[in-house]
Amino acid sequence: MATFQFDLVSPEKLAFSGQVDQVDIPGVEGDFGVLAGHAPVVAVIRPGLLTITAGGNQQKIVVLGGLAEVSDKGLTVLADVATSVAELDTAQFAQTISSMESSLAGKQGSELDRAIERLDHYKSIQHQLNATAMH
């Protein structure tokens, strides 16, 4: 299988850089996969699990939004936050969800709508993590 250059960058670090076979990205308009030779595109990323496949191995990364750019040079993802599932503190993640739920009562209108949407994204990630842990 043909490979391509993939760089995953967050404000804290270069989370990944190397040749990959495929990257599956949680897009705002739907999840999508990128292979070598993919058409150029820029897409907004929603919070979710990004999956990197290289040499038959998969690595899952939690991303909390950002941008993906596919060009003739490869794929670059600029993520607001990027944390490897292996490094994720699942208890802390669950506590964050609990805190988000508690704070909903103090919000109204569009602020409440945004908070609910963000909470839904976190719960979706938690569900994906739990499903991944069972495999």
From Swiss-Prot:
CDD domains: F1-ATPase_delta. Pfam families: ATP-synt_DE_N (PF02823). Gene3D superfamilies: F0F1 ATP synthase delta/epsilon subunit, N-terminal. It is a peripheral membrane protein. It is found in: Cell inner membrane. Keywords: ATP synthesis, Cell inner membrane, Cell membrane, CF(1), Hydrogen ion transport, Ion transport, Membrane, Transport. GO terms for molecular function: ATP binding; proton-transporting ATP synthase activity, rotational mechanism. It comes from the Bacteria. One of its GO terms (cellular component) is plasma membrane. SUPFAM superfamilies: Epsilon subunit of F1F0-ATP synthase N-terminal domain. Its main location: membrane. Produces ATP from ADP in the presence of a proton gradient across the membrane. HAMAP family: ATP_synth_epsil_bac. Belongs to the ATPase epsilon chain family. F-type ATPases have 2 components, CF(1) - the catalytic core - and CF(0) - the membrane proton channel. CF(1) has five subunits: alpha(3), beta(3), gamma(1), delta(1), epsilon(1). CF(0) has three main subunits: a, b and c. This is ATP synthase epsilon chain. It comes from Rhodopseudomonas palustris (strain BisB18). The gene is atpC.
